[in-house]
């Protein structure tokens, strides 16, 4: 990621293969815990490799960065096709590195892809993997897509017992997963 960015270029097919295997930090909270002696090398390596902002975001993402298995994604696309969807504006509101874009069936390739990812590392990887997609690296609550713009929204929204601040939806007191569903439907 950093090599491509420092050289201001797209990722090669080999680099894309490597980058597409990134699955976030959801399964590695111990790597961010300095009190875990068995993880001390990984802890230090992360501190050395990541900027302060990247490190803080990666540590925070251990709470909800869980990626969707390809078989689930394929099944979701099969349902869409069975319902008659062929092309249109597709939103992935919490995209990680874009696994849903990577498994987009051939029959849906005429669609325009839009993605949103809060985590900087995941979002930057997604931009390298899918340069033709419109990807925003920010919280979903900070996007300003017009209502009724998307034909389909697909993905695996974050789940948790915490809320997102968005004036348009604050009155509903949604937990994060409910918020994502409500905003996506609008």
Summary of predicted features, one role per range:
Residues 1-186:
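Class I S-adenosyl-L-methionine-dependent methyltransferase catalytic core
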């Amino acid at each position: 990621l950093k090599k491509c960015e420092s050289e201001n270029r797209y990722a090669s097919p080999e680099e894309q293969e490597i980058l597409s295997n990134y699955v976030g930090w959801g399964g590695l909270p111990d790597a961010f815990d300095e009190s875990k002696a068995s993880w001390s090398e990984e802890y230090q390596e992360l501190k050395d490799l990541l900027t302060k902002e990247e490190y803080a975001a990666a540590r925070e993402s251990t709470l909800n960065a869980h990626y969707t298995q390809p078989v689930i994604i394929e099944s979701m696309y099969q349902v869409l096709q069975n319902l008659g969807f062929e092309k249109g504006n597709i939103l992935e509101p919490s995209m990680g590195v874009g696994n849903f874009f990577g498994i987009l069936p051939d029959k849906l390739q005429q669609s325009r892809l839009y993605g949103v990812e809060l985590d900087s590392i995941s979002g930057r990887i997604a931009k390298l993997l899918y340069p033709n997609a419109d990807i925003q690296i920010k919280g979903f609550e900070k996007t300003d897509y017009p209502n009724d713009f998307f034909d389909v929204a697909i993905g695996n929204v974050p789940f948790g017992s915490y809320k997102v601040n968005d004036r348009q939806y604050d009155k509903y007191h949604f937990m994060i997963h409910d918020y994502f569903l409500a905003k996506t439907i609008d």
